[in-house]
Design a protein with these regions (language model features):
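Eukaryotic N-terminal low-complexity, Ser/Thr- and Lys/Arg-rich leader segments
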Residues: 1-38, 209
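Structural motif
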Residues: 40, 53-55, 95, 107-111, ...
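Short amphipathic alpha-helices and their capping/turn segments at secondary-structure boundaries
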Residues: 43-47, 92-103, 137-143
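Conserved, mostly hydrophobic/aromatic
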Residues: 56, 73, 110, 151, ...
C-alpha cells in the first residue's frame, strides 16, 4: 500500500510562511488573522492518501462516482463506498452528504456537489453554490466529530470552474465560516486545501491569507 500522510505532516500556512516555502500575497486578503494561518493548510498531493478525519470529494448529483478525484476516491475506498452512496438518493448542487471511508485512510468522506460553472454563472449562482459546498461540508464535519477536513478543488475539473475564481470563493467561504461562530469553528482544528494539479495549487497561493 502506498504511504499515507498524517495530519502532523501537513504544514499550516504559518509554518509555510516561517520556513519561506510560501510568500505572502502582494495584496493583503480581507479578514486575515493568525488563527486562520494556524488552522488552514495547503498541500499538493493525492487526497486519497491523507489521514485527516474527513476528506471532501468533488461529487456529482448522483453520488455514484465519476471521473477525476471522484473516481479516484471511489476506487481507493472500494465498492462498499458505492453501496452506501446508493442509499443516499443523490445530493443537490451546493449541498453535501457524509459517508464512511472504508478502505481510505481518513475516517469519513464528505461528498460535496459543486456547480457546473457555465450553467451556474448564467444563472448568477456559481459563487453562492460553490461556497455553500464548503460551508455545508464544514457543518457536516462538526456534526460528525471530524476535527480535520481536507478539501479537493471542487468544480475545477470537468465542471469547468476557473481555478482562480474557485480558490477565491473557497478561501472566502472557509474564512467566513471560521469567523461566523468562534465557538463552533473551534471544533475544527485543521482545514486543508489539497490540490492535485499545479494550476489549482498556484490559485490557492494567490488567495490564501
Amino acid at each position: 500500500m502506498p504511504p499515507t500522510i498524517p495530519l502532523s505532516e501537513i504544514p499550516t500556512l504559518t509554518l509555510l510562511y516561517t520556513t519561506n516555502r510560501l510568500t505572502p500575497p502582494e495584496t493583503t486578503q480581507p479578514n486575515v488573522n493568525s488563527i486562520h494561518n494556524d488552522k488552514i493548510s495547503l498541500i499538493r498531493t493525492d487526497i486519497t492518501k491523507l489521514r485527516t478525519a474527513a476528506i471532501v470529494n468533488a461529487a456529482n448529483e448522483s453520488l455514484l462516482g465519476g471521473g477525476g478525484v471522484d473516481g479516484a476516491i471511489h476506487r481507493a475506498a472500494g465498492h462498499s463506498l458505492l453501496e452506501e452512496c446508493e442509499t443516499l438518493n443523490g445530493c443537490a448542487t451546493g449541498d453535501a452528504k457524509i459517508t464512511a471511508a472504508y478502505d481510505l485512510p481518513c475516517d469519513k468522506v464528505i461528498h460535496a456537489v459543486g456547480p457546473v460553472y457555465a450553467r451556474a454563472k448564467r444563472e448568477g449562482m456559481h459563487t453562492r453554490l460553490l461556497q455553500s459546498c464548503y460551508t455545508r461540508s464544514l457543518e457536516l464535519a462538526v456534526d460528525n466529530g471530524c476535527r480535520s477536513v481536507a478539501f479537493s478543488a471542487l468544480s475545477t475539473g470537468v465542471y469547468g470552474y476557473p481555478s482562480g475564481e474557485a480558490a477565491e470563493a473557497a478561501i472566502g467561504a472557509v474564512k467566513g465560516w471560521l469567523d461566523a461562530d468562534w465557538q463552533r469553528s473551534a471544533k475544527i482544528e485543521r482545514i486543508v486545501f489539497c490540490s492535485f494539479l499545479e494550476k489549482d495549487e498556484r490559485a490557492y497561493e494567490r488567495f490564501i491569507p
